[in-house]
Every structure is written in structure tokens, then in C-alpha cells.
Amino acid sequence: MADSSLVGGGEEPEERVIEAALRPKNLHDFVGQHRVRKQLSLVLEASRMRGRSADHVLLSGPPGLGKTTLSMIIAAEMNAPLRISSGPAIQHAGDLAAILSSLSEGEVLFLDEIHRMSRPAEEMLYMAMEDFRVDIVVGKGAGATAIPLELPPFTLVGATTRAGLLPGPLRDRFGFTGHLEFYSVEELELVLRRSAGLLDLKVNSAGFSEIAGRSRGTPRIANRLLRRVRDWALVHGIEQIDARTASAALDMYEVDKRGLDRLDRSVLEALITKFGGGPVGLSTLAIAVGEEPETVETVAEPYLVREGLLGRTPRGRIAMAPAWTHLGYAVPEGVFGQEALALFEVEDLGVEPVAEWLPNGQ
């Protein structure tokens, strides 16, 4: 069975240690995200010139694109200590109050998955971000008293994969908001070149290209695949990694040319061979591949939808034309994805509906 964490979200403790060692330490070394990097550099430089803490920063985007790394870089660029916590760890206002009250002046507080913080903690954070003050409630009922607690100036860096779940009042309190985009293959090759240098690996250009092409546009995955290829080359006594070596290693781990892993291909295979390309409901599809519906929806579907291999419709999931081609099947007439108009719903096109899922309304 394939290592399901290879292109997924899970990381072993040892992997996290290695990943941390590969992180760039300043904006100059950070590859990609040119727009966000340029804007953030200006914000930090202006803050240093004023001799004040930087504005609060909100970073959004898919996992693995560098939100945590950028928080560390912000602290390093401001020559400030960094405190790391996460939304799920702050379920009560008291949890947040304890963290805020222990911050030193200028410290950077990084809150990962900030959208998962509890509502009482969010409301306390409003005042802390705007006025650098929180009210600590002592006692209960009619005898409860709010004691104001002054906080030193600090910089909050929030990270989220679901910016739409953040309340408007919280989003509005961030002075800078940056959205991280998926990386191009060329940018991932630059990431891999830097990592290979730090790991003292010999990789040629074709090897970098092969790994980058299977990395789903995500640096975290690219670095993970590089380490697995390194292991394969070490065991097989290969000194320089080329395209053939990288391909053989990643084929063994069941990561194909488009970055699809075992689960991704199982979902598409089931859609095509068991349900004729769909539509089929999520629960039924999950049973067909032997996984939980949540796993299919959160692990496999985002990448498959982004690549145009799977479609989500009101009636269920469907295999798009490129999925049939990628798995080596002939594309039946009328399968979505063959024409640009097939990407839109009938209501979007403003035309009369035809018989559902049949070509030319037949």
C-alpha cells in the first residue's frame, strides 16, 4: 500500500524536524509567492523604520504553501521572539488570556487554524488586537467584575485554510492580508534545488523537474518527495538523482506523473468502472473505495477538482473527461470536461434544461 501521507497532510515527528531544517529563515530565501513577499517586505520595513511592532498579519491559502514559515520569517525580520499556538488549542477565553498576558513587547504570536478558535476567545481577541487590552472577568453572576489588563504591543500572525469562516470583525482587524497561491513547476524546482543543497544531494535538472511535476504545486509535498527519492537512491547505491531515478522511486510510492496517489486513483477508478462516470453520492463513493466520506471529501477531492479530474454537482460526483484519459479509458461521448460549456450548470447558461446527463438532450 502507498504511503498515504506522502502527498497528504500527515507528517511524522522526524519529518517535521527535517522540514523545519529546510525552512528559509528570511524573505530573501523564501521562494515563490512574489506578490505577498513583496508586500510583506514593505510592511515589515516600514515597521522597523518606525520602531514599532508590525501590523497584524493574516495569511490564508491551502496547506503546505508556507504560512508557518512566513510567520517565523516575520519574527526573524523584526528581531522578535515567536510564540506558536493554534485555534483548536484555544477553546476558552481564559486560554487566550493566559497566552496574551505572557507576551513580551514586540513578540510575534502565531495562531495556526485561527478559524477554529472558539467564539468567546475570538471576541476577546478583538480588543487585544485593537487596543492591546483584555478584560478579565472575576467572579460569577451579579458579583462578576471585569478587570482590565493592559498588554504590551505585539504582532498577531493568523493562518487559515478557510478564510471565509473568519468573522468579519476579526478579518477587519488585520492590517495586512496575504493569500498564498499554489506554486508553478518552475518555482517548485527552485524550492527543490535549495533543499537539495541543504541535504547535500546531487540531483540534475531532469530529476528536479520529475519531482516538481508530481508535487501538487505544494512545497511541503515537494520536499517530502525529495526525501523519499533520496532514500530510494541511497538504498540502490545511486549517487546522482536523475529523472529515471526519481520516477522509479515515486512509482514505488504510487505517486504518478500528475501527483495522484493511491486514494486519488481509487476514487476516479471507482467513479468510472463502478458508476459509469457518475453522478454518485459521496457516501456511496466512499464505501466503494473503502474510506470514510470525510477522508474522500477533504483529502482526495480538493486536488482532483482543482486538476479538472472530478466534478461536484447537485446530483453527486462525476468523473471529468481528463480523468478517463489519465486512467487509460476511452472518453464516452457527452462526458463533462470535453467542452468549456460543460463546466457550467444549466442555470448559469440561461437556457432551457435538457434531459439530465444525456448528450444533446437525447
Swiss-Prot record:
Keyword Zinc-finger appears in the UniProt entry: no
Binding site for DNA: 312, 317
DNA repair listed as a keyword: yes
Binding site for ATP: 22-23, 64, 67-69, 130-132, 173, 183, 220
Residues binding Mg(2+), per UniProt: 68
Ranges where the record places region Small ATPAse domain (RuvB-S): 184-254
Pfam families: AAA_lid_4, RuvB_C, RuvB_N
CDD domains: AAA
Stored SMART domains: AAA (SM00382)
Gene Ontology biological process: DNA recombination; DNA repair
InterPro entries linked to this entry: AAA+_ATPase, AAA_lid_4, DNA_helicase_Holl-junc_RuvB, P-loop_NTPase, RuvB-like_N, RuvB_C, WH-like_DNA-bd_sf, WH_DNA-bd_sf
Region (Large ATPase domain (RuvB-L)): 1-183
GO molecular function terms attached to this record: ATP binding; ATP hydrolysis activity; four-way junction DNA binding; four-way junction helicase activity
NCBIfam families: PRK00080.1 (NF000868), ruvB (TIGR00635)
Protein task: The RuvA-RuvB-RuvC complex processes Holliday junction (HJ) DNA during genetic recombination and DNA repair, while the RuvA-RuvB complex plays an important role in the rescue of blocked DNA replication forks via replication fork reversal (RFR). RuvA specifically binds to HJ cruciform DNA, conferring on it an open structure. The RuvB hexamer acts as an ATP-dependent pump, pulling dsDNA into and through the RuvAB complex. RuvB forms 2 homohexamers on either side of HJ DNA bound by 1 or 2 RuvA tetramers; 4 subunits per hexamer contact DNA at a time.
Descriptive protein name: Holliday junction branch migration complex subunit RuvB
Native source species: Arthrobacter sp. (strain FB24)
Gene this protein is translated from: ruvB
